[in-house]
Curated annotation (Swiss-Prot):
Stored SUPFAM superfamilies: Nucleoside phosphorylase/phosphoribosyltransferase catalytic domain (SSF52418), Nucleoside phosphorylase/phosphoribosyltransferase N-terminal domain (SSF47648), Pyrimidine nucleoside phosphorylase C-terminal domain (SSF54680)
GO CC field: cytosol
The protein, known as: Putative thymidine phosphorylase
Record-linked Gene3D superfamilies: 1.20.970.50, 2.40.40.20, Nucleoside phosphorylase/phosphoribosyltransferase catalytic domain, Pyrimidine nucleoside phosphorylase-like, C-terminal domain
Enzyme class: transferase
Catalysed reactions, as listed in the record: thymidine + phosphate = 2-deoxy-alpha-D-ribose 1-phosphate + thymine
PROSITE patterns hit by this protein: THYMID_PHOSPHORYLASE (PS00647)
This protein's record includes keyword Chloroplast: no
Organism: Legionella pneumophila subsp. pneumophila (strain Philadelphia 1 / ATCC 33152 / DSM 7513)
UniProt keyword terms in alphabetical order: Glycosyltransferase, Transferase
Length: 517
């Protein structure tokens, strides 16, 4: 509604719009990071303001304010005069049951005009990118509006200059760490490969050499395990920025969950929306990786790019473009990037899922005879590249030095010290239920579908159930006999085990066997 009055000369004047008040009811609805407001279909505010389903509404409680998307309730869930909020919106406003909120139309968003400009192919300035990223982070742009920006930025529509501007805007959206050492190394994998948990081996190797490597890692969103999920089976990863700094200064390295420290927080929102629309854009990927590395305070970064038909990067031409973008944009922003191509044709190691991957990591660090050699070699290659960032390590000798640090036990000792500094080393758990999947015939493994195997591990309960996942027994190029296990599904519940087995009946081409020569 409006406050209105007659002016001295008899004219009708409309003054500032008065927000409407509604009483809050806690509904307990989770929408992840999306702010939703729930109002009755017959709500007087909806009628007077013209609010409809999906309308963006300014919601104010005291000094706090958010923009939320309207969902309309047609049942008696809400009483007249009441409104509900999603848990994310509730927490953002620090709301309590019975609080009165004010609702009104928000001001037009400047950022939305820049999103439209990008849709029509215009190049955006740094200031325009910054306005978009600020509105992404504050929640003023809805998920639908963010997805429009992501789609407009995909398929090579961002110029190299725009990628640099986007990266810088994302860095500026959060905190930026600084360290006393002039050389700070970081390591990252672009993803798409189950079991590729090299970080937990690379960090202690590099730290035991004396280089600083403060590693922030993500949790899984669509994969069976993120690095943070796997590390969490062995030590706490939810550290405050102060505790993280203490661990790094004490041990030269850490492996913590990046969500606990505010480094490029806008990237987390963009990733969430990207996953929902299944969109992978080279420009967004470069900005995502580099913004996190630079915000962590790194001066040098080693980037692992697995290349394979069912990996995130499917072929060599895509890999070359990504490598060039990472190195050029990194250089423009003062970060030395070394991108390495690795085999992405099949999972790394045996385990897929937090505890099973952690078991493989410990086997490599301890030099056990059953340690997966592919995980060991990949980790040594990446650790060697990281060591060569130091002037103390001649080019080409990094891997041999990394091997010495691993085989001498120094790396495992450092890993134990990092775990203790982060809160104490934990014992791994084992799943209650297992189901072996056997070869229907004899033959040689010719192909493994990374995505389908990862999906089975997720249906089995990973990463929520730390011990759930898959134990892979056969790799590409290996011969198997009829009836020999190809992989074993691990699950904490029979229900989830049955879900995973149901997918097996529909997907018979997860592991393809060719004829033995």
């Amino acid at each position: 509604m409006h406050d209105s009055f007659l002016s001295a000369n008899g004219g009708f004047v409309v003054s500032k719009k008065t927000p409407h008040g509604l009483r809050l009811k806690h509904l307990g609805i989770k929408t992840y990071h999306e702010a939703i407001i729930y109002m009755r279909e017959d709500c007087h505010v909806c009628h007077s303001e013209g609010f409809e389903v999906q309308t963006r509404i300014q919601v104010t409680l005291g000094s706090r304010s958010i923009i939320a998307t309207l969902n309309v309730v047609t049942s008696e869930l809400l009483q007249p005069g009441e409104a509900g909020l999603s848990d994310y919106a509730w927490e953002s406003l620090h709301a309590k049951e019975g609080d009165e909120i004010q609702v009104s139309h928000p001001k037009p968003l400047e950022s939305l005009s820049y999103v439209h400009a990008k849709i029509y192919g215009n190049e955006l300035s740094f200031e325009q990118m910054k306005v978009i990223i600020d509105d992404v982070l504050s929640g003023r742009l809805s998920d639908v509006q963010i997805s429009a920006f992501l789609a407009a930025s995909g398929a090579g529509r961002l110029t190299r200059t725009e990628v640099m501007k986007l990266t810088k805007a994302m860095i500026d959206s959060g905190d930026r760490l600084s360290w006393p050492s002039p050389l700070v190394v970081d390591k990252h994998c672009v993803g798409g490969l189950p079991g590729n948990r090299t970080t937990l081996i690379v960090v202690p190797i590099v730290a035991s050499f004396g280089l600083m490597i403060p590693k922030t890692s993500s949790r899984a969103i669509t994969s069976p395990a993120g690095t943070a999920d796997t590390m969490e089976t062995l030590a706490p990863v939810h550290l405050s920025p102060q505790k993280m700094r203490q661990v790094v200064e004490q041990e030269n390295g850490c492996i913590v969950w990046g969500g606990a420290v505010s480094l490029s927080p806008a990237d987390d929102v963009l990733i969430r929306v990207e996953r929902a629309i299944d969109l992978d854009s080279e420009g967004q990927l470069v900005a995502s990786i580099l913004s996190k590395k630079i915000a962590t305070g790194a001066t040098h970064a080693v980037i692992d790019i697995p290349v394979g038909p069912t990996a995130k990067v499917r072929n060599q031409s895509m890999a070359l473009l990504l490598k060039q973008s990472l190195e050029e944009v990194g250089n423009e922003l003062g970060l030395v990037v070394r991108a390495l191509f690795t085999d992405g044709s099949q999972p790394v190691g045996h385990g897929i899922g937090p505890s099973l991957e952690a078991r493989d990591v410990l086997a490599v660090l301890q030099g056990l005879p059953d340690a997966p050699n592919d995980l060991r070699e990949r980790a040594l290659t990446l650790a060697g590249a990281a060591l060569e960032c130091s002037s103390k390590v001649p080019p080409g000798l990094g891997k041999s030095i990394a091997t010495q640090l691993l085989e001498s036990g120094q790396a495992f000792k450092k890993f134990q010290a990092i775990c203790e500094a982060q809160g104490g080393m934990r014992e791994l758990t084992k799943a209650r239920f297992t189901y072996p999947v056997v070869a229907a015939k004899e033959g040689k493994v010719s192909l493994i579908d990374n995505r389908k195997l990862a999906k089975i591990a997720k249906l089995a309960g990973a990463p929520k159930s730390k011990s759930a996942g898959i134990d892979l027994h056969a790799h590409v190029g290996e011969s198997v006999e009829q009836g020999e296990p190809l992989f074993t599904i691990h699950s904490e519940s029979l229900g989830e085990l049955h879900y995973a087995c149901d997918l097996l009946r529909d997907k018979q081409d997860i592991i393809i066997l060719g004829e033995n020569p």
